[in-house]
Amino acid sequence: MATIFFADPELVIGHGRRVLFVNPDDLQLFKEIELPPDLATCGLKVADSKEQHCQHEQQDVAAAGSAKQSSNTASASASKAKAIEVSIQNVSYSPDRQLLAITTTGGQKALLLYRSRMEHARLLSVRPLARASSALRFCSDGSSVLVTDKTGDCYQYDCVEVEAAPRLLLGHLSVVFDILWTDDQQHIITCDRDDKIRVTNYPATFDIHSYCLGHKEFVSGLALLTEQHIVSSSGDKTLRVWNFIEGKELLIHQLPAPAVRLQVQQLEPEKVYQVAVLFYDHVDGVAIYRLERSSGDNWAITATTVVRADAGLWNICNFTLTGNRVYVTGAENECLAIKAYDIGSGETSTSVPDGWVKMVLRGLEAEGVAYLPEDLSVWFKKRFDNVSDYLERKKRRIEEQQQQKCG
């Protein structure tokens, strides 16, 4: 998975085992992070005895195979390295930009915490994850970070006691796609594949404060607007604004296609926002909406800008906004591709220096390397029409009974 986001003044791009921090104005490289192929070399410990036992069994099998086939030692080593090689899943900055969190997937699932500076980043801890992460979010003061996984569990990791064990806070029955933590740290807001938005009290996370219900498909993204309001995007082709304290829907805006990514920028505090949505399988790649609050709970979409982003010609997976540009990542000719478009015109940005994309791909060690993006079609619910089959069988049974009576 390729992750990309803008944290002023840095454009952050993560892929494989590398994260690049780029100045979006002059596109110069601030710093970079490279993870080792084996996280055990930088402090990763086995999560539990069961996992350790499995790891020992794998080592025994590898050793036995090596003893039987000494001529294939190099091949066995390569296979082992491939089995444990990690890949970056999520990257997130703390609000003050002092900490950086990275989660990995692949052979070793872990949370890596860094102390970040403009020119470098220093590794603080490496903690194992039970499952692959799906979302990542720091609290407002950066003292802890929330990690959700593919099974719907949400864990809190301490960023002061960096080696402390995680605390299980809450759980969903399906994968959590996004998570918010309010600035006052009183509420944790999560959304999942089962079209639910849940508002949970903190620290008493056994107490659910409210639900924001109305979406008919997966809720792909959330963003805080004010102390009481959030915006959500969904696969049901809607963008909605909520008063999450009351669990009340305030605005529903129809989209031309399912929304799979959401980005929000504040233009005027608690009043005007730029809301960008990445569409799934649509002729337009990205739409940018101007969301305005007139008073209280009154919200409206007042303008729309479309960035086609050559949709349909390549597999778009992620995007971010950087003021006057939209940066989009995806797969083109089965390789990772990064493209920049001007928000105003929606066309390919002419101000991006020639060769910049190649430089970034080279820095990510992704140039010419096969890239398989996430299959977003699995996010949609699988529906089975059992009623039609039942009615058809019932109809045939009645017809057979009538024929028997006539006979």
From Swiss-Prot:
Give the WD repeat ranges: 83-124, 171-210, 214-252
> Which superkingdom heads the taxonomic lineage of this protein's source?
Eukaryota
- What Pfam families does the database record attribute to this sequence? WD40
In which pathway is this protein known to take part?
tRNA modification; N(7)-methylguanine-tRNA biosynthesis
Additional remarks: Wuho means 'no progeny' in Chinese.
Q: What is the role of the protein in this entry? A: Required for the Mettl1-dependent formation of N(7)-methylguanine at position 46 (m7G46) in tRNA. In the Mettl1-wuho methyltransferase complex, it is required to stabilize and induce conformational changes of the catalytic subunit. Required for binding of nanos mRNA and repression of translation by the mei-P26-bgcn-bam-sxl complex. May cooperate with mei-P26 and nanos to derepress the BMP signaling pathway. May cooperate with mei-P26 to suppress expression of a subset of microRNAs. May cooperate with mei-P26 to regulate bam expression levels in germline cells during gametogenesis.
Q: Which family does it belong to?
A: Belongs to the WD repeat TRM82 family.
Q: What is this protein called?
A: tRNA (guanine-N(7)-)-methyltransferase non-catalytic subunit wuho
> What's the encoding gene here?
wuho
